Amino acid sequence: MASMDSTPPIDCHRLIVLFFEAIPGVNQIKAAADKLPRPAAVHLAQCDAHSERAAMWTRNPTGRLAIGRLALEYASEALDWETATAFADTLGGEAHWCLGASPIAHPLNTALTFSGTLQLCCFERREGLSDEELKHIWFNEHAPVAVETQNNVGYRQNLVLSSSHSPLDGIVEELFPIAAAASLTDFFADGDDPEKMMNHIQRLTESSERVLDLEKSSVIHMTEQRLL
């Protein structure tokens, strides 16, 4: 199990583009991105035969489940909103401009495809949470629980500031080894201990419900690759 950074500060801005109908090709993405300020990293995730192995984790109470995700990372507010939405429109996606934190750094340091799966969770906050409460609870209190109770090897939080379509509050990106795709015990980082597994599930569920509305959150697994 990966270890969490001692403090998960907001360390970047991310433009998250979600695709619901079709996913653009890599060359199309690169051509469109050439017109933007150069990002520090670009990741593309999409549903395919590989990620389908983790279909048991899919949740779609909202009826809107993304089939692809593009993430561009910037060290500062280098991208204005009008440019961001135009970029997403060109690719046929929805733009979400976010403050980003990385409790567990992304394991792909070069242009490779991750051997496991990316779990993408798009959510609206629990009713009654203010902006500051959402930010504090999610980044400072929930993040350690999410790391302690799951076998995630990458964990990135995206607090949504602006959305071109869906009114999302947060986008979670977690990377899991392929062994966790169809195994409760491998997913919840407990080996073969059923009692510990149930404890992890209970802790994670209770902590998650402090942050998000489970009936307004979707979960899908994708195959992740780094383009830049």
Regions found by a protein language model. Give the residues of each.
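Macromolecular interaction modules
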Residues: 2-228
